[in-house]
UniProtKB/Swiss-Prot annotation:
UniProt name for this protein: Glucose-6-phosphate isomerase
Source species: Desulforapulum autotrophicum (strain ATCC 43914 / DSM 3382 / VKM B-1955 / HRM2)
Family, similarity comment: Belongs to the GPI family.
NCBIfam families registered for this protein in UniProt: PRK00179.1 (NF001211)
Pfam families: PGI
Known role: Catalyzes the reversible isomerization of glucose-6-phosphate to fructose-6-phosphate.
Enzyme Commission designation: 5.3.1.9
Active-site residues, record numbering mapped to chain: 356 (proton donor), 387, 515
GO molecular function: carbohydrate derivative binding; glucose-6-phosphate isomerase activity; monosaccharide binding
Length: 555
């Protein structure tokens, strides 16, 4: 079992508090002036990736104290527990073993004394056989035409992870093969997705462990109806629908061949499941060999995380620096800013991974947490964000620690595009750190012929105070291995934060209440009766909806 220690009561936390009082006003620019080797000392290399944490409001003592906190709260022991299959998801009585899905070593991974690896390898082989047929063009539909479009129907982890990876690794896709993702129960999502598709060349992947997930099965039923309107014969469903599920009876009742049912396990959380059969859409789209490379990248980072001392452990360092900002500087948000269009869904993916994992207010003792937990995670690809919210990053009243991610080599070299992109990335990180003081702004404005009252009036608006922290992750190219390593790095960062904060990171009870209430409201929408069973606001909203719908229907 994980330690159950209130971190705020530890000696290391208290020492960090005293240390914060002494360093909170330190200027990062001064730290660089004092230490010409700061970048060299505070950047970490891993495979084809460098993680630079030098632009943070930290000193060597800060890092030492943060590592003391990690040790005192049992981070190293928690890492070992996860890898050996202990039931660290205590509220659900489950192991947490997404690392087993990408375990490429010839070593067992045990749950209750049973090795899960034969089952993992069995599903991977099933995925290999099926995805190879799709990727190679051998998989045909009822009219013997090659499959050209894959539609993945899922929600949450069954959607965000595969969608993010498929988008990021699109350069590895087979020409003529397209992938689409449907998650929202809003009918517009599936209707717009299916427009222009041909039932005879479309493959549907239904991702629902229980095959009862309301949003997913509603969309699946609509997809089946659309398909049959074109195909006619219900017998053709088996050639065009596959399931990622463990409910064989429901899968077969839907019309899916049991041989096309891909299983996974309760020790895989949804937001950590892209490495499992949930990644089937990715394997079909980019080919199984490239999917295996994704697993290899994750596995390599797992080995680093499991075996590297805390001080040099990239996920641990990132986690502890984040805790420094969340709990001592009281910075409530973090921005994820990928300077690679392929990573356009990465901020949303991390938003779920972080906020669903660590957005908790009850600690492992069952008490209310007295300290902040998960930051709000958000972001957009550069340079789009620069023309949207970077104004706040540079001059707003809230300081937002940022993660910049940028490749050295683009998959789509085009003139000066990539060099301009990279220049913007590095410039933004530098500007956040250095800012621009009054003297520099005055010189610049004077050189442009501005002086006197106008200069004095505009000067305060053009000053950037700087000292705003960021990490920069530079990688050679967005390959499957690099992406796998980056995803695993952030997964482990999130895990370490949850351990230190004394919360359970692998449940999501906060999702359940809204789902239960929706099940109560849904039948109340079917008639014209006035609803009085909820609070005044909810009753009012339901009844307004009914009135509006009724008027629309009559018109």
């Amino acid at each position: 079992m994980l330690k159950k220690i209130d971190p705020a009561q530890t000696e290391s936390w208290k020492r960090l508090g005293r240390h914060y009082d002494g360093v909170k006003d330190l200027a990062m620019d001064d730290l660089f002036q004092q230490d010409p080797d700061r970048f060299k000392r505070l950047s970490m290399a891993f495979k084809d990736m460098v993680v630079d944490v030098s632009k943070n409001r930290i000193t060597d003592k800060t890092l030492a104290l943060l590592m003391d906190l990690a040790r005192e709260t049992g981070v190293k022991e928690a890492i070992a527990m996860m890898f050996r299959g202990d039931r660290i998801n205590e509220t659900e009585g489950r192991s947490v073993l997404h690392v087993a899905l990408r375990n490429l070593a010839d070593t067992p991974v045990l749950v209750d004394g049973k090795d899960v690896m034969p089952g993992v390898r069995g599903v991977l082989e099933q995925m290999r056989l099926f995805s190879t047929r799709v990727y190679s063009g051998q998989q045909t539909g009822y009219s013997n035409r090659t499959i050209t479009d894959i539609v993945n129907i899922g929600i949450g982890g069954s959607d965000l992870g595969p969608k993010m990876v498929a988008t990021a690794l699109a350069p590895y896709a087979r020409k003529g093969l397209n992938v689409h993702f449907v998650s929202n129960v809003d009918g517009t999502h599936i209707v717009e997705t299916l427009k222009g598709l041909d039932p005879a060349t479309t493959l549907f992947i239904i991702a629902s462990k229980t095959f009862t997930t309301q949003e997913t099965m509603t969309n699946a039923a609509s997809a089946r109806q659309w398909f049959l309107e074109g195909a006619g014969d219900p017998g053709h469903v088996a050639q065009h629908f596959v399931a990622i599920s463990t409910n064989a009876a429901a899968v077969e009742a839907f019309g899916i061949d049991r041989d096309n049912m891909f299983g996974f396990w309760d020790w895989v959380g949804g937001r950590y499941s892209l490495w499992s059969a949930i990644g089937l859409s990715v394997a079909c789209y980019i080919g199984f060999d490239n999917f295996k490379r994704l697993l290899k990248g994750g596995f390599d980072m797992d080995c680093h995380f499991r075996d590297t001392p805390l001080e040099q452990n990239i996920p641990v360092v990132l986690a502890m620096i984040s805790i420094w900002y969340v709990n001592f500087f009281n910075f409530p948000t973090e921005a994820v800013l990928p300077y690679d269009q392929g990573l356009e869904y990465f901020p949303a993916y991390l938003q779920q991974a972080c906020m669903e994992s660590n957005g908790k207010s009850t600690d492992r003792n069952g008490n209310l947490v007295a300290h902040a937990t998960s930051p709000i995670v958000w972001g957009e690809p550069g340079t789009n964000g620069q023309h949207a919210f970077y104004q706040l990053l540079h001059q707003g009243t809230q300081i937002v620690p940022c993660d910049f991610l940028v490749p050295a080599i683009s998959h789509n070299p085009l003139g000066d595009h990539h060099a301009l992109l990279v220049a913007n990335c590095f410039a933004q990180a530098e500007a956040l750190m250095k800012g621009r003081g009054e003297q520099e702004v005055t010189r610049e404005m004077t050189a442009k012929g501005m002086d006197g009252e106008k200069l004095g009036r505009l000067l305060p608006h053009r000053v950037f105070h700087g000292n705003r922290p960021s990490n920069t992750i530079v990688f050679k190219q967005l390959t499957p291995e690099v992406l796998g390593a980056i995803i695993a790095m952030y997964e482990h960062k999130i895990f370490v934060q949850g351990v230190v904060w004394n919360i359970f990171s692998f449940d999501q009870w906060g999702v359940e209440l809204g789902k239960a209430l929706a099940s109560q409201i849904f039948p109340e929408l079917a008639d014209h009766e006035t609803v009085v069973t909820h609070d005044g606001s909810t009753n009012g909203l339901i009844n307004v909806f009914k009135q509006m719908r009724s008027k629309t229907c009559r018109s």
